[in-house]
Amino acid sequence: MPNMKKATASDNIVGMRIDMDIYRMNIDAIVSHLKRGFKRSDDFKIGIEIEHFVFDSNDRSAGYEKILDVMKDIMGEDDKPYYLEGHLIGFYNDRYSISLEPASQLEISIAPCASADELVCIYRDFRRILDPALSRYNLRVECYGYNPYESAQELDIIPKKRYEYMDRYFQKAGTRGRNMMRATASVQVSVDYSDENDAIRKYRLCLLY
């Protein structure tokens, strides 16, 4: 029978010190990463990613195959397709990239711009291409935080191994992981900062929204 040694107070203290050291290392790594992001104000850019739900006339999610047809329809000569495991899952050009989230949410990632006005112009140009194509397939996009029409379990995952693995993991871990993957859409904004105080000020301002 193995010799089982009871943990002592000294062992517990050592364990706590190791945990604190790891915690401190993580904090230092985060601070170092944020400091590397300091930029001069004349180099400031702003970036944005917008995720959309794509619905048909019955308020059902379009799904990968229909959105695939739309993507092929709107791709121009200068657009470069992005394939993964033989499946088209997006395309990109100098102004933006188009990709699909786990349950076929359509995402546009606009290249960093000097002003919000530039971002708006690029997004409007994209919608002028996208919306007519959607209409031809009796589809539309909506910008909700959560799918208001369907449960997460009803929504299929696109053919991407990483999402399949994530989906399996979330079936066993936590309670809302699959809901996050399949039934949510978001807007993500990236803002440059010059120093720690500038970063704090902008972060607090963003929290107001």
Predicted regions mapped to residue ranges:
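Conserved small/polar residues in nucleotide/adenosyl-binding loops
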Residues: Y209
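Terminal catalytic/cofactor-binding subdomain
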Residues: P2-T175, A183
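Inter-helical turn/loop segments and adjacent helix faces that build the functional surface
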Residues: C121, D192-K202
